[in-house]
Amino acid sequence: MPMNRREFLAASAASTAMLNQGMTAFAAVTGNIQVTIDASKSGDPVNPMVFGGYMEPATTSVWAEMLTDRKFANPITDAAPAPAPTNSFFRRFFGEPFKPVGPAGTVAMDTVRPFVAKHSPLVKLGGTEPRGIQQSKLRVGRGKTYEGCIYLAGDTGAKVVVRLVWGRGAGESQTVTIPSLSPEYKKFPLKFTAAVGTEDARLEILGTGSGTFHVGTASLMPADNVQGFHAGMIRLFKEAGFKMFKWPGGNFVSAYDWRDGLGDRDKRPPRLQPMWSDRAEPNDVGLHDFIALCRLVGAEPDLAIDSGFGSAREAAEQVEYCNGSVETRMGKMRAENGSPEPFNVRCWCIGNEMYGPWQYGHMSLDQYCVKHNYIVEAMKKVDPKIKVTVSGASICEKSVGGAEKKGNFFPSIWEPPIAERLPYEFGSVNDWDGRLLDKCVDNIDYLSEHTYAYPDLAFDAEKQLFVDVHDPLQFRARRLANRIGEAFEAWDKYVEKMPWLKEKDIKFIFDEWGNRLRSASGNGGGGFMRQTGMLMPLSYALCFHEMLRHSDMIAASCATGGLRTVLTDNTGEAVGFATEGLVMKLMQTNFLNAYPIAVEGDSPQQLLPGTALVDRGTKPTGSPTYPLDILAAFTSDRKKFLISVVNPTEVGHSFTPKISGVKLRDQGKLYQIAPPDLSSTNEVGKEPAVKINETAQNGLPETVLVPAVSVSLYEFDVA
């Protein structure tokens, strides 16, 4: 008989010693760990959407477009541009702008006859001297073909060529000659094949002759793109087993108008996105494109709507656009844009972090409760079958945000200093989940929780600041899982205060989670881009274990770095899995719809340094098998038995399993990630140092040896 959540967690933690909240000393491991697994005590099936990824901004690095600001949201000027970011991820969004070619004053921004932006480049010709615009720092691969288009208008005396240049020699480029121009914008195809690979190619749009010509927009992509997306990323995301994508944010959504992403891609208006430092958003990835991505990968869409500047009417129209028949006004518009069949989007997130003053359209908690109800009631009037996620925050999420503010982690003159002591109190004006659950409970299906951890920091309750800690690997890796655990502690507190919540089937969606790597002073940062060896993969594995244990309380999750867990070459194409990507693949391809089983042990987990309900809970997370973390489960058909073991230490350990309630066949498999050392990582152009190794097993050993810095998944058929 399935166990309820409290019985399941109580069984899993039966051997865990209760530790004082302020305890910072760690018990030493002695002897072999004794583990008991009772297969008759299984939990609810794991929702496949736990294995999700998160996309922000609207047009992400998954998109194959090579040109920055291709619709000219920003003017082209003679002034020297700001240096382009060196990081390949950010180059895609804040990269090299178009520059004028020719003497000063050659290029003007015409606001009278713009193509799609508020202005378009107007090039003044000067006879035989080539004049126009160019964009540098393009990344091309040897022998790789690139295709695109350009919209041009101009005088008949203008002779225009478009050239892809990959070197300095006369033969180190390829040219497309444009037929004669007309006063009206026309679309011309482009196609190039690069003879060499370089990260400093450039696209030139040049004219000679007399008169002027306008550039409306230009586009260039690898020819092997799949509906506009990088082919390698589609292949690897599908292989990894992503089952949900959240889009278009994140902070991005609170100033995003979904209608900007409809219609002909080249004619969608570009915008300067205020939530991303006025980055030029071309709106190339719109609603239809996002749905196409989900279908290519086999993932469910999770659409975030703008509850900041956006209205209830706009949200309802978006639901009708996605799910309405062609007989409805918005459904007819969807059909006119190429999709007569409804998208049938079921998951909708109402805004993002609306508790934060950094959010466009931020308002007080009492006002937001009213707005949330207005929006959801309007949406469900259109389609009662949709599920909505409230943009709230437990006091844990709010308290971590307060701790970041106290440490000035994200400087802003618009956010007031934090005067209150942390953690915030339940029922206070900072308790967004508490108030929303009280005032909006009939309009909530899921609770959003954004869960970020700092592996090298702990919040000091006395100093009221994050401080540097020098913990062993197992505690650094476990901080993220502890943040997951404290969210469930907060839920239990809400149920205690509002008993009627027991009758509601409200679940969590951890729609942003990950690690942030920095010191208390801010040195050594680099966020998700920093190379960390096996720290991230171990942390991801422990986080998944904790979420799967709470299968009855989680509807979905989205790793913030989930869509960047692939390796990209110097052209931006995905060519393999990063180390954390392998962990996600291992978990996502084995635990879909699995039934977690209670695990007991004789080695309780240890309480981490920090402050309860800020950066950790009041009790440790994980199975009572310290320092190992063990998760057992049946596969969805109950024909296979799984034991997943994470060893987040730099030494080997062993455990003796005692399994009851099921009989296993001897023949089995072991899928194992066990690299040579902690610093092991995968790099482009090199043989992977971290792999998933598969070996046959002849029965589960009486004593299981677990290598250092490893994730091991045993699979046996049920007899």
Regions picked out by a protein language model, each given a short descriptive name:
Residues N4-R6, A28-N283, E300-D302, G310, ...:
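Extracellular and organelle-lumenal recognition/adhesion modules and their flexible linkers in secreted
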Residues E7-A27:
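N-terminal export signals
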Residues G53, I150, G241, C294, ...:
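Conserved, mostly hydrophobic/aromatic
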Residues Y151-D155, T193-A195, T589, V646-P648, ...:
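Solvent-exposed strand-to-loop "edge" motifs in beta-rich extracellular domains
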Residues L203, L365-P537, Q605-K619:
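Noncatalytic carbohydrate-binding groove/subsite architecture in carbohydrate-active enzymes
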Residues M330-M363, H450-A453, D505-W513:
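Active-site groove signature of glycoside hydrolases
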Residues I506-L628:
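Aromatic/acidic polysaccharide-binding cleft in carbohydrate-active enzymes
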Residues S623-D666, L670-I673, S712-L713:
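Carbohydrate-binding surface patches
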